[in-house]
């Protein structure tokens, strides 16, 4: 009888060391860094977003249709970039792809400071969508890499909150800063600084070596 009871306990996992092991840590250092970098992407992006129509109207006298086209151009290039970003991320070292695309996304904000004719601003703004699209794909891929398989679904859920949190607070902060300073250039430069922080954060992530896809 004693042997039978012991067998039942073992079958239930009471004395099974494997069943007593805790779940792997979700908020590891790499995940926190990638999460923070993603927050910086959307924070810097949304910091200027609500002010762009006002900027284009006041600085260039642009009409509603022109403003809509310029904002639409950013979205289109971001969507097109995302179509190819997955392949690029899998075909080349992820660290290189992420840091390069993130750096381009960051430095494009400096292009807003150049001024010049409306056409030049429209070109800069439209092209800016490409590194935004590729950066979001690359950063999400790295987030998956640094998560333990047992915590991956949960981790992706929390990762998405970084987008939501940045989108919720950044526009209000941008509008408040503009009301205090009354300077569009300051907002553009702050967006550059916040996005540059994201680049620096990601540069400290320990990337897992991905198997590069070879064409056959």
What kind of feature is each model-predicted range?
Residues 119-127:
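Paired small-residue
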Residues 27-70:
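Helix-loop boundary and gating motifs at the non-cytosolic
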Residues 193-214:
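C-terminal membrane-cytosol helix-exit motif in multi-pass small-molecule transporters
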Residues 61, 93, 114-116:
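Helix-breaking motifs and short loop linkers at transmembrane-helix boundaries and internal kinks
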Residues 126-162:
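Cytoplasmic helix-loop-helix junction between adjacent transmembrane helices
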Residues 75-79, 83, 167-168:
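Residue-level signature of mid-helix packing/kink "hotspots" within the transmembrane helices
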Residues 96-110:
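Structural signature of the two symmetry-related core transmembrane helices
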Residues 81-93:
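Helix-to-loop junctions at the C-terminal end of transmembrane segments
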């Amino acid at each position: 009888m004693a042997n039978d009871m012991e067998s039942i306990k073992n079958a239930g996992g009471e004395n099974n060391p494997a069943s007593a092991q805790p779940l792997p840590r979700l908020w590891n250092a790499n995940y926190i860094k990638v999460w923070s970098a993603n927050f910086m992407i959307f924070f810097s992006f949304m910091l200027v977003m609500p002010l762009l129509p006002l900027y284009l109207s006041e600085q260039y006298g642009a009409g509603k249709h022109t403003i809509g086209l310029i904002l639409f151009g950013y979205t289109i290039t971001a969507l097109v970039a995302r179509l190819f970003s997955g392949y690029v991320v899998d075909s080349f070292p992820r660290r290189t792809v992420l840091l390069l695309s993130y750096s381009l996304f960051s430095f494009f904000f400096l292009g807003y400071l150049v001024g010049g004719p409306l056409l030049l601003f429209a070109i800069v703004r439209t092209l800016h969508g490409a590194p935004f699209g590729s950066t979001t794909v690359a950063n999400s891929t790295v987030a998956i890499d640094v998560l333990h398989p047992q915590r991956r679904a949960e981790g992706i859920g929390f990762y998405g909150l970084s987008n939501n949190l940045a989108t919720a607070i950044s526009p209000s902060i941008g509008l408040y800063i503009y009301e205090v300073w009354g300077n569009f250039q300051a907002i553009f430069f702050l967006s550059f600084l916040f996005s540059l922080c994201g680049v620096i954060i990601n540069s400290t992530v320990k990337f897992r070596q991905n198997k590069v896809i070879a064409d056959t």
